[in-house]
Amino acid sequence: MTHDGTWSDESDWEAVEFELDEAAQAPPAPVVAVVGRPNVGKSTLVNRILGRREAVVQDVPGVTRDRVSYDALWTGRRFVVQDTGGWEPDAKGLQQLVAEQASVAMRTADAVILVVDALVGATTADEAAARILLRSGKPVFLAANKVDSDKAEADAAMLWSLGLGEPHPISAMHGRGVADLLDEVLAALPEVSEVAPRPGGPRRVALVGKPNVGKSSLLNKLAGDQRSVVHDVAGTTVDPVDSLIELGDRVWRFVDTAGLRRKVGQASGHEFYASVRTHSAIDAAEVVIVLIDASAPLTEQDQRVLSMVIEAGRALVLAFNKWDLVDEDRRELLEREIDRELVQLRWAPRVNISAKTGRAVAKLVPAMETALASWDTRIATGPLNSWLKEVVAATPPPVRGGKQPRILFATQAAARPPTFVLFTTGFLEAGYRRFLERRLREAFGFEGTPIRINVRVREKRGARRR
């Protein structure tokens, strides 16, 4: 294996399989969340930590984006840095939104960096976030950003008032003080993430979808009708997070149910608030039920939520809610919309339900079980390559640049979701990879789970001698 991930000889295969298997079994890296109000330099700090420009940075308050996680490495230690993004706030909604950001970070991170603008000083929003973080019991580091002079460093000292201990004066833009901050953060991190889901225990389910699609109603129907709520599991000092519900002779953990039960206010930025909640629930789940309003046209927001689930690699069940409101004409129109808008999701089990009346709600359990079984599936290397040989012989990859790439070998690098690596002599077009995914599903099932197909191109034999 070469430094850039290409490979040079068939003798590398066993080593590559071992390497991939080790990576798949590696314990989850600890997570550091970067939080703070808009325009304090969160994304700039994330980019500085990563050593590359990944997070969106714009010199205006509230570049509206979603929370994103990146793999990072510092002094030989792996960790994940979580950029909590920004929003377009107004004075009325800002404090609530920063507080929500902090509470999500408490649940999803092992340590938190609160970024404050040292030139502005502590604001009421900063104070609200600090109060929540202080109650978390997790390591919290105060980064006093935009410190580019001795005077600014003196201003940073005033941030002691937040009660988070000594402020760390930094300049995310120029790198000043960031190394010292990171050294302290990593010294406080556990070797293995303490917030990552542990194997075993009840399977974790998230109910997500656009506002007013019926998430709370479905949760109440599942819990109330079955009379089977075991208890609410205390998650943080802010609110209970998960609910354990017995369905189909097993207990399921429905994650972030506090977010479903609390109504989101009409303050500016509430869409970001909902997006943070959705990301948090998806990250914590193994299988995600995406609720879609069957009585109304599919929306861009529906598509965004579905994209979040696919990108996170979670098992997926589609629940078309409000079926009691759907007449025959709407059903025909909906089928056409699904064929047009969700053509890439034909693998996801679909259940037509009414959370209000309870129609077909019981069918969600077998759909979740099917999706999770697929999500957990591993295909042995022998059968996988026998299948691949037949498929490629019947439909070889298209010619690219006058040459036809050959697929020499395949292995499943991971499950949850099933992830495959193809070793080739050249690049494979996206269309051909989609074709292989369809054939994989035909041969091995995978109903209810995304599949990832990665390509590693073999290095030319003379490349390493040049």
UniProtKB/Swiss-Prot annotation:
Binding of GTP 2, residues: 209-216, 256-260, 321-324
For this UniProt record, give its keywords in alphabetical order, as a comma-separated list: GTP-binding, Nucleotide-binding, Repeat, Ribosome biogenesis
* Binding of GTP 1, residues: 36-43, 83-87, 145-148
Instruction: Please indicate if the UniProt record lists Magnesium as a keyword.
Output: no
Output the Gene Ontology terms for molecular function: ATP hydrolysis activity; GTP binding; ribosome binding
- A Pfam match: KH_dom-like
Q: Which residues form the signal peptide?
A: none
Q: Which GO terms describe its biological process?
A: ribosome biogenesis
Q: Record's family?
A: Belongs to the TRAFAC class TrmE-Era-EngA-EngB-Septin-like GTPase superfamily. EngA (Der) GTPase family.
Q: What does this protein do?
A: GTPase that plays an essential role in the late steps of ribosome biogenesis.
**How does this chain assemble?**
Associates with the 50S ribosomal subunit.
Q: What is this protein called?
A: GTPase Der
Species whose genome carries this gene: Mycobacterium avium (strain 104)
Point out the gene that encodes the protein. der
